[in-house]
């Protein structure tokens, strides 16, 4: 039998990768309740990328029913690391991406919140970055060094410790966090099971986008 679990879902127009940082500004009632419950219980929620619909519920032009929301079946657990309530009806949170999962079924509740039954996808094995992909790693190190040099006090960088420079999966995920490409393309990367292949695909994308990589750089 499959080892499945239930989880609340947060459909977004973005893709969260394992180890990635996701800041969110929450003001919809359905998600205020969700986040408050997750924070209280120390439980994660599932981030899934929308294929149709909006992050904020909107009624269609004809009728009073909220516009349909559709999303990819592969998502990532989001663990709340920072939780603030600066005013009533507003939450500011920062999440960290956890394990990937595949939805087996999902259901929208009466108040608009989505829940799903899911199974975990296998965690990436730690695969060292091979010599031919070292420039991809070096490019990311240089980019982080540039971000650190430009950062102002209080700025939060999109790449956070622990830094795992010799891990194909981690390097690929951090590039995917920051690359200016569509959520649909990022979703394809998320679904790749082999971390070495994922990093190779990222390297091919960097070459097409003419984003610089290089053979020489020290660790950030």
Model-derived features with residue positions:
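N-terminal low-complexity, acidic/polar interaction/targeting segments
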Residues: 1-220
